[in-house]
Amino acid sequence: MNNSNIDNAGWSFDNTYSKLPKSFLSITSPTPVKSPELIVLNDDLVNELGLNFSKISKKNLSELFSGNLLPEGSKAIAQAYAGHQFGHFTMLGDGRAVLIGEHVSKSNERYDIQFKGSGKTPFSRNGDGRAALGPMLREYIISEAMHALNIPTTRSLAVVKTGENVVRENVLNGAILTRVASSHLRVGTFQYIAARQNEDELKTLVSYTIDRHYPNIKKSKNQALDLIEVLMQKQIDLVINWMRVGFIHGVMNTDNMTISGETIDYGPCAFMDIYDPKTIFSSIDQLGRYAYFNQPNITKWNLARFAECLISLIDKNKDKAIEMATEIINSFEKNYEIKWLNMMRDKLGLFGEDTKDQILILDLLNWMHKNKADYTNTFCYLMDEKIKSDPIYKSENFILWKKRWEVRLKINNNTPEKYFKLMRSVNPLVIPRNHKVEEALEGANNENLTQLNKLITILKKPYQNQKSMMDYQSPGSINGKKYQTFCGT
């Protein structure tokens, strides 16, 4: 098969991670698949990467994104990492994913290009290395929705069907997702290297991470300590964004916390409809470890595990190093509270600060919880009663709260033009409603891509009032049952 058009599509690989010590990775290749078929290609991301596939046939694109054909300059590896999974430490690694290389765009941005579901690797343990179509399309839908919501995230470039079945509880269509990320460095990467107790390797990893993501701390007197601080701020910003839109990750293991501050791994994730801080969707999170309200606490817990990895580099005196790291981690709550309060002020169009703001915000959330109000639609109603009306907003308690809010809006020279502009920038009109995601996945599994393509299109502009969005705004039920998600591994 002619590979020239694929090689001439604009790829520019500069593979730095594969030059790290052998313990960091394993050289491997995607396992060829029988008859790949391209299901969805992200044209917007293609352009952002500076690629041009116009001269490549759909058949050859299918071969490319299945891993059957690799572009010139790529170097396929599986990355080693560990992780606390639901609090239990495990040695892991890319068990069903292959990083084919680091593509550098014309604007000098570096991107990992990874195939997920591409076959067995040395880290697969007892897994088959494969993925099913539903979970790969779910990641495509939700990661791209998160990007449109202005939330840091890995991206999805393409999904192909492999033409082969994967066996889980049922026999499913096999698929491969092409994931694009600033990097795949994780807290779990540091845990893996720290567990090897090789300080030179740990220093190499810290240096590599700073060069790649945080060059502003390169001249720091204590790089390890500053790396903890900068990652904490990144992760606080990320989880606050999740809370802003009602996103529940579902599997916040340390191997799913990136050093770049991007959301990664969309296995059992979902968006909250009715506001309930204890909402969980994941079938394997029976105790609610990763419930909506607990996401900040888990973020802090994961950061503490990250800090533990760096103790030996912070100070030669272990007790002093622990004290210094602990001081940073213990500042999490205060930093989070300030940023969360500011985020909620933005959602309500409030400028400046007022001592009663927190009470006003909590009273609204408590009302929403008590009255089973839709989280997203409540803020839509406050922006424009015509966008999403509901009899629930005619209740006496809500009207009384709304009057207090309207009084607060007038503080600090606020005007309707100013506060509505602010609210519209942070309150989405549409989110990936769970029933709509399921409809799209069911259609795709039955070779009907209509609902999938409609959903992807509507989610590209979540802050804009679109003619066809009304059908995507209402919460739904999955055959009247409580909605559950599954990790898809």
Question: Language-model segments: what does each one mean?
Answer:
Residues 1-5, 16-20, 96-101, 161-166, ...:
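Short, mixed-charge, low-aromatic patches
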Residues 29-30, 128-130, 225-226:
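Short, contiguous strand/loop micro-motifs
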